[in-house]
Amino acid sequence: AAGAVAGGLVGTAIGKYMDKQEADMRQALANAEAASIQRERQVLDEASRRDVDVLTVTFKSDYLFAVNSSSLLPGAYDEINRVANVLNQYPQTTIVISGHTDSTGSEQYNQALSERRANSVRNALIGMGVNPARMTTIGYGKSKPVASNATEAGRQLNRRVELRIIPQQQ
């Protein structure tokens, strides 16, 4: 019973930590054109059934990158810096940076582009003081669309970089 109580207290502390980080991130992104934030419960590890609150910051790729490029546009640094400032205040989280593309172009090309874009955001965050040991990157190419690729508006939503901010297990 003591273990359950201790686990509950740790869970409550982690929840409050993520609550505060979410509030600070929402404030930092209040006027952002290129980024949005969402919070959801996710099961991170099927074996332990550890479910946690995960914050996801989504950057619209059109604001960060030119078409077919993984080089950050000058205005992208301001948007990324808003996020970096909050990440630096909350070091007890890990960050999974994922790149996504629309379905235009070959699967191989989109996969490589999504990986390069995720790495570009990671490198910018490192340059802004975020500890590289906290971050991993992954490219999904066109495999995880959030909208239809049949319209330009849908393709625009699918071109994105997401940061999943996950509390570290205490």
Describe each region flagged by the PLM:
Residues 1-24:
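Short, low-complexity, glycine-enriched hydrophobic/amphipathic alpha-helices that associate
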Residues 55-60:
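Short, aliphatic-rich beta-strand segments
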Residues 19-54:
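Amphipathic, membrane-active segments
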Residues 98-168:
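Periplasmic OmpA-like peptidoglycan-binding domain that tethers envelope proteins to the cell wall
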Residues 12-14, 64-73, 107-110:
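Second-shell loop/turn segments in exported
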Residues 2-3, 18, 69-77, 111-114, ...:
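Solvent-exposed, acidic/flexible segments
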Residues 50, 64-98, 126-127, 156-158, ...:
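Periplasmic peptidoglycan-binding/anchoring modules of Gram-negative envelope and division proteins
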Residues 21, 25, 76-79, 83, ...:
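Stable alpha-helical elements in mature extracytoplasmic
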